[in-house]
Amino acid sequence: MRPLLAVLFLVGRIFSPAYSLVMLVRAYLYRNDIFLKSQRLPVPVISIGNLTLGGTGKTPMVRYVTRLLLDRGVRPAIVSRGYGGKAAGRINIIADRTKTLLPPEMAGDEPFMLAEALPGVPVLTGSQRVRVARHAVEAFGANLIVMDDGFQHLALRRDLDLVLFSARTLLGNGRVFPGGELREPLSALNRAHAFVITGVDSSNRSVAEDFQRRLQGSFPAKPVFSGEYLPAGIWHSSQDKACTLAEAKSMEMFSFAGIANPDSFHQTLRLEGFSVTGSKEFRDHHDYTAQDVAALVAAARASGAQALITTEKDFVKLRPFFGSFPILALTIELRMGQKFDLFLADHLSGHAL
């Protein structure tokens, strides 16, 4: 944990009970339609969210679930809040069924990534996700909505609530914000239909399995799945230069990331056998500048690195600054397994899609 965050949580601990109460009352009001109304769409809604602050692999999971839906002949649309994007409309169409319409600085890095990875799938953002989701149904004929980061967005009813936990952070310190990483008290997990532990690997498998048993003991009626990240390929800043995973691993790299859980990225590089000479971290959703890139190149050269390596999320924002020094991105896919695929198919079988 970063020192500043640790201090914030220590100071904020006294306010955690009050924040917990606010979130409990809010959920109660939505659940009973008192002052706060939860609206249902004419199509199914799958929410992919988390209980904790920070990264739990929601974007790879949205990508994975959406591809499963496409394979089943479903016409999904993705709805997101669009954090980090400058598009300020009530409804922002990041991608229609033909192409990506907004650049990453307008769309937000995660929605842009999803639009690029899932051609033909409408991706929309906006703060009022009920309005945005209705537009996706009416304008694009979507017959299912995938809501990114939707667990706390109770204004939109959902038919399947998937709650993700990172195998590297799990529940953090177990306290509710501002004294810890939890967005809500643990009792909020009663709303979920299933849990997914993401990023399981050899370094955390035993801890993840222990946490899975704890979840199963506390919520015996809710299935718990786990998924692992697998390297899918390498993006290279020079579009005319192909680079395989094997070639990238033979190079000396300087890594950097501006994501919620940068340790996860650096750990993945180490586990996959990349040779890393140094690293740099930026805040989540960081907007890179030419000065940032120049400083990164200088640090990489000073460390003896032959190239910079970063995440997909960061890479898409760096295109205006590509130069002669190579910048690579490690692309990651989430692998779930047949049990999860069957669970999703079974859950959808009751809907006319």
Predicted regions located by residue number:
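A transmembrane-helix-recognition feature enriched in membrane-embedded lipid enzymes
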Residues: 1-44, 351
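Residue-level signal for inorganic ion chemistry
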Residues: 18, 59, 114, 148, ...
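Glycine-rich phosphate-binding P-loop
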Residues: 48-65
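N-terminal phosphate/diphosphate-binding loop that engages ATP/GTP or pyrophosphate donors
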Residues: 64-124
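Phosphate-binding/switch loop-helix module in NTP-utilizing enzymes
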Residues: 117-157
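Conserved catalytic-core segment of NTP-binding enzymes
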Residues: 138, 150-247, 254, 266, ...
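Short, flexible loop segments at boundaries between secondary-structure elements
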Residues: 230-232, 282-287, 325-353
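Redox- and metal-dependent alpha/beta enzyme cores, enriched for Fe-S-associated oxidoreductases
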Residues: 235, 239-241, 246-290
